[in-house]
């Protein structure tokens, strides 16, 4: 099958949607499909060969974050070239509501079109105002996908449609291998029971909704020996006992998660899924997360044995209490780790990609994607 993927967000900066699309494309290519991805990317940005670079982008504030989007006449030209040259059987547009490559592709393309919705928010007056313009375009979508129940509900309430739920995917084998390597290294080093437990955070340091300051405040209330590693781009704080390692590669991220004991996700809001929670679970971390609806779903908190422990959003003292509890209670910590590893398997790309392919097969009618 010839598959075209369209991304609204720039590949110049790391992000969950971009990572999801690159992973999905890689899985399908490994299965023998032809796949290309179109999205904003500067000439100097290092991306896989299957990415068609769509040029520069500008930062736009949205949903508590900053998204880098492309606008202008070059977007229209490149979308048309992408569709004509690709001869695609399916065009898969991510975040079709975003005013960038995705929305333009949806307005231009005709034929077998699939869309994935990642974002969620309480409400959007802007989208309500834009609904008369968006609705005719959204009707062109033959197969809708939402990565979480929050994203699905938001789309249905704001703009209609009935997307099915297919979560984000994770290559669990990478994180499982990192965990095994870390365990082997610990065994070779001898008894590691006396070492301080390692707590890890991953997120953009300058984005308040990622909650780093909540974690740093919580550390003031933890009187147990610990080591803390912070991954992510931005301005590092000067904090004793905290190692700011900056932006890391995917392999280094897996390695750090594989050796860590507790992963903390203190995010304040604006999350519709929480892919790094799944990565941490697959790597054998006990997960402590803020009680966002999206995180509660990933942690499966209604289960007899949840896969994560939640704390009150924004409450540094409650976070400190939960971390201290896991440090002191090895049995609970190991139970969370075991449940997390099992939970992560449900998000493995083998399952997720197969579900997406079923949607592709459903929307095909023997015609090619074309410029309308």
Predicted regions: what they are:
Residues 286-289, 296:
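Short hydrophobic beta-strand element within catalytic cores of glycosyltransferases
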Residues 301-316, 324-330:
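Conserved acidic donor-binding segment of nucleotide-sugar-dependent glycosyltransferases
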Residues 318, 325, 332-346, 358:
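A short, well-ordered alpha-helix in the C-terminal region of glycosyltransferases
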Residues 153, 167-195:
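Acidic anion/phosphate-binding donor-loop and adjacent secondary structure
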Residues 41, 150, 169:
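Carbohydrate-associated surface elements
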Residues 121, 127-143, 150, 157-158:
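Membrane-proximal helix-turn-helix segments that form the acceptor-binding/catalytic region
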Residues 185-210, 216-220:
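Conserved donor-binding/catalytic core segment of Leloir-type glycosyltransferases
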Residues 258-272, 285:
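Acidic donor-binding loop of glycosyltransferase active sites
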